């Protein structure tokens, strides 16, 4: 599924929210909907406020930063809360967030962060190091609070706040992600009142107290998320007064809304299809952005769902536990055809786990290791594995029954459906049946392990630790009744050992080499088969948005950034202000902060490494 996208692992307590939200498709008054015969222009509300409306295909899994993993949700949290550090929109290196500087002890086991004194919560209270210490300590001591981002604090020994502007984190072992802790810092005076972090979704009382560039003011499940500009944000107030994320189940309807001016921006599901993008090319007042993406698009195979306590659950097909079968299936997937016929060139053929946008970590299998497209060899593998065809040309399992695999498919993603039809053809030629289960809610069967294969995808951060952690044994649920951070129930000792090594390695080149070994291991296991690296294809109205920052500055995406840069920097088209929306202007602000850091003699021991071009 995917996002950190991060787009998966919905806590069981959220299922009722998701199910109830599926029926709530009517927007509040003031928002354009298919039921509104006279939808308002997105660029300005009736009261003169400048509103930026973003059409999205994904629904919110939770508005709690302790639970959310979907790309939309984590993107909203980047707007609501500051993180200790941020990613530079130009090249992804670490820049100040809530922390103005940071340094480590010689042994790299103690990290000290200076917390800025000019960040306030939206209720007027000062944001301090105590808020950060409380956030991390809560994640360290409460399993519910560790649901989404627990991997970041698993190696923490102690976190303290000696003063309002000083945060100290002591580690058990060296940890290479200390300037890449993608954890929203929340206000202690608000969140310490929460009794059950595994159930609290932060979606009942508005406005929600935060200290980011926007304040959450309204939400309706599967309808909209509304935020207003934080006029006291320390980096400067956004130029738009309001930001609205509006849910569209039908992406053609979202594209139509963009044409009519009912929305300012459309992201697609998770990108525009080639046909949608082509239909917008050359349209008046519409700009299409087509850039290398930070996502991978994969087929995940059920490895036999199990919990940390060793108990198995779910009903994945037993034949998929044979690596020869998994390899045969992938060798029967024509990835070039997927790029050409489904993505129509708006993607790169997939192999390794991390997209080529992040060159430091990009890995490709060797010629002898690669599972190249070879249907004949795939058939031979299945024969050798004992899954031969019967008289009707159908492959049969050990139970003598014809094999048909259930493939989980996102109902809102046209790529899933298109690739699924090809799988029915390609695997059908092997004698294997395919049943596409295209659902609005794939979370329930996924968490229950009731699938054979599934379309999967995650947005990768400049520091890839999170997307690596979701395949460790430690990410499994504690029991079959619990929810873990796991993506696909993979648990492999060799992979776990490599994960621990990369996390403790501060040398960038050495760490990158270990990460590539992890990708190689994941590839060989055959449970996560990457088919493509889709481009970020999106569009916006130039008569509503004058300028907006892409990330990275050159050939970057707008939606789903590792930061708040796009929506914070966006300048309304009818605004006389030209200082806040360009990438150059944003970089200038960052550069000023870095000059201050250098003047203070800060030593940054570890930085987020950028890819050649650039969750949740």
Residue ranges and their predicted role:
Residues 114, 148-194:
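Surface-exposed binding/hinge segments that line
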Residues 100-145, 168, 245, 254-257, ...:
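Aromatic- and charge-enriched surface segment that lines or borders ligand/interaction sites
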Residues 53, 128-135, 168-170, 212-213, ...:
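Alpha-helical secondary-structure segments
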Residues 55-106, 137, 207-209:
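N-terminal lobe/hinge region of extracytoplasmic solute-binding protein
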Residues 25-27, 36, 44, 220, ...:
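Detector for C-terminal structural segments
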Residues 146-149, 158-159, 217-228, 244-312, ...:
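Extracellular/periplasmic solute-recognition and catalytic clefts
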Residues 183-238, 242, 375-376, 380, ...:
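Gly/Pro-rich hinge or "lid" segments in bacterial periplasmic/extracellular proteins
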Residues 56-77, 98-100, 125, 178-186, ...:
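A structural "hinge/loop" feature
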